[in-house]
Amino acid sequence: MKRRDFLLSLAAAACLPGCHSPSKPGLPPGNLLGAGLERGHRLRGRDFPAPSETRQVGVAIVGGGIAGLSSAWKLNKSGFGDFRLFELEDETGGNARAGHNAVSAYPWGAHYLPLPGPEARDVRELLADLGVLRGDPHAEAPVYDERFLCFAPQERLYRHGIWQEGLLPQIGATRRDQEQYRRFFDLLERYRQQRSATGERAFAIPAVLSSRDPELLALDTLSMRAFMLQHGLDSEPLHWYVNYGCRDDYGSHHGEVSAWAGLHYFLSRDGFAANGDGEQVLTWPEGNAWLAQQMRQRFDERVETAALVHRIAEYPRHVELDVYLARENRTVRWRANRVIFAAPVFVLPHVVADLDSSLRDAASAVQYAPWLVANLTLGEALQHGNGAA
């Protein structure tokens, strides 16, 4: 299903509460929130006013999601203040924005952060700067502010009328299934312990710091499903579990996700807290919008929202950016020494003049999967039923 059709079907369902089976309750009242499409779609028509003035800046950052905000944070933290961040929407945050109601703040999208491992040095330094991480950010197991560590039960699976802890199916699993579970996790552990000749872990975050051993890179040539079958793992509930993980992280079936990517999902999140465990995550009522807001506060005066970058042109000594200011209905031309492009990749061919054909083809080939976060306000406590509370 195309993203547009998916969103329209949700909107239609929300608008037709009376059109349902008499035996089933209708959808509760609510809103479908997301990116404002109209402003971005102006890139197709190119009907922007000519620039009314020209300004100078050292670094221009295109996009105010977590990537753009963290780039700005890094520059600012390093003592470099000659930058400007441009965000299409009325608020920064991108997929890490949030809303509020009478009960609580709630995330629109990204809603937790796995504990960063030792390779994620910049992430740890960011968390230390924001007061989330206490003490040495490069300790093997740093101390985190316990207000932000998720101690509550994180995942539940409803199977055969019973709630169980975790997502790996246990209720109804046969002895053969359990044996294959053990073999699968033993296999993961062998990869977890593997190191390259120069000491890199097999799978790390950032991914660029993962081992480049040919044996591991060859895993990118077969699917995660094929990899499992190659190792004699054909348990149906085990395949369901792995497929769930691939759909969650990549938006695709484990028969389409490469074995390298599938293993990276299971093995790259290895951060620990001195005052917690490796299964915990960092989270806030508003999700990762908390991180976005905390970063922006440090350089708010250098952020422009409702600012659509519709042209980027590179010259020998500078880069030109034409920025449409929606609130003022005018275009400002910026001349920058450097540009950090932190907007979605598919936008590149629409804004960069004379984009290299290989980059254009690569950007056009990127596919995105729809991702919906549902926030529910409950009128009364849930009835847990049988199984794990």
Predicted features by range, described:
Residues 305-389:
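Mid-domain catalytic core of redox enzymes
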Residues 63-65:
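Glycine-rich Rossmann-fold phosphate-binding loop(s) that bind the pyrophosphate
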Residues 76-99:
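Glycine-rich FAD pyrophosphate-binding loop
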Residues 103-191:
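Dinucleotide-binding Rossmann-like beta1-alpha1 core, especially the glycine-rich loop
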